Amino acid sequence: MNPVSYSELLRLTLPQIALTVAAFFVLACDGMLLRRSPIAVRARIAMLLSVAGSLVALALLPLTAPVQLLDGMLVLDARTGVVQVVLLLFTLAVTLLSGSVLAQQGREVSAFTTHIGEFFALLLFATVAALFLVSTQNLLLIFLAVEFLSLVLYILTAFNKHSRASAEAALKYFLFGGMSAGFLLFGISLLYGVSGSLDLQQIALAASQPDSLLLVAIVLVILGFGFKIAAAPFHLWAPDAYQGAPSLSAGFIASSSKVASFFVFAQVLFIGVASASGNAAWHLSAPGWMPILAAVAVLSMLLGNLAALAQTSLRRLLAYSAIGHAGYLLLGLIAHTPQSLAALLYYVFTYALAVLGAFGVLAILETNGIDSLSSLAGLSRRSPALSACLLVFLLSLAGIPPLVGFFAKFWLFAAALQAAPAFGLLWLVILAILMSVVALFYYLRVLRQVYVVPMAEDATPLSSPTLARITLLVMAALTLLLGCAPNLLMRWLR
């Protein structure tokens, strides 16, 4: 192991330290100074402290030349820096939305939680885990970060103590998560047995030699990460978790967690076991992780999009939609080129932006008693601003130009087509396009309720927190801006 520069290590981990200090400060302030204060006051102060911690972490991000410490335990480069910036921005958005919604509910917040400080501290702890997860190439630290992040997400899912659905969803999430952790740890132990190292670079050297044990290890790792990204058939936790968790907890799971999980999954496959990729092309099929991922992608696209057609709950619709999007994202891994990795990251960033915005709108709607498709009738007349935001987010998820979701799909599908000779992945791209058409149908079904179906005669205008409304409008504007200038983000990922 190379000598450790502790000053350099401290400098590179300052964002995580800032978030950790902010989390403990939020807990101490809420628990000791504000426990008897009105819930609205506690929510606003916890939100401000969390926002301050996130902004300090953003300012301390080490955007420097590529650096590697502790033999791959801490690896930072330009691409990792972009991922960390995105994760912190999503944390900021969730914090602003949560604080404003909780503050508006005031004493009625018991419908969600009275543990204000704990909620915001957990968001910050989850972000710390995600930042460590995307900045390491050591399998042991990857496993520890994944499981710490998962543990926080289990708690966030169960945070509504007054909801049996929340507790049931968290239990299912925990049980499936524990099983997936076992698969992932077993796979990591086999990779260590094959290579004698936990560093992805060293594993890559050992993986260049054919070994049946290596293929077993790869299958187990795919099983473990398949759960984290909610890909079929490892998706069974997702619909219940998305439906039972508090709206903004579900939004955080669907956005930040998915960004971090896909990035580290790509790192493991592209760096550690790239030589065992095989081939998923229709005319050049060869054993490896590519054909396995191709089967998972097909199942995810079919099951996710077809099941979403039958949903009447907005949350479950977004959950099955997430499964379908996981199938599209796997195309970026199957293509296995630098262009496909950039397209995958672009897609997962823009998907996370849109789905977090959709859950933000849903959080406000649920405070007004709207939680199903039928109750959306006439929403455009009751709240034009929220309806416009929902329109932008859903059409971006559907991939409609000129929104950013269209360019994300275009670049991802184009990278998949160019990856294999003779358009070997054309069959997967055609299926993805067909399933995108199916997805458009159920997104338009939601928008039909919002804009076409008349509202009930006794319906009243919706109340929505000003800060939450501004946050959602900024996110919708960003979705439009990135669609009008798609290279604005892509140039940082190439």
Curated annotation (Swiss-Prot):
Compartments where located: Cell inner membrane
Single GO BP term: ATP synthesis coupled electron transport
Keywords annotated in UniProt: Cell inner membrane, Cell membrane, Membrane, NAD, Quinone, Translocase, Transmembrane, Transmembrane helix, Transport, Ubiquinone
Listed transmembrane segments: 14-34, 45-65, 82-102, 116-136, 139-159, 174-194, 214-234, 262-282, 289-309, 317-337, 344-364, 388-408, 422-442, 470-490
Leader sequence segment: none
Enzyme class: translocase
Protein name per the record: NADH-quinone oxidoreductase subunit N 2
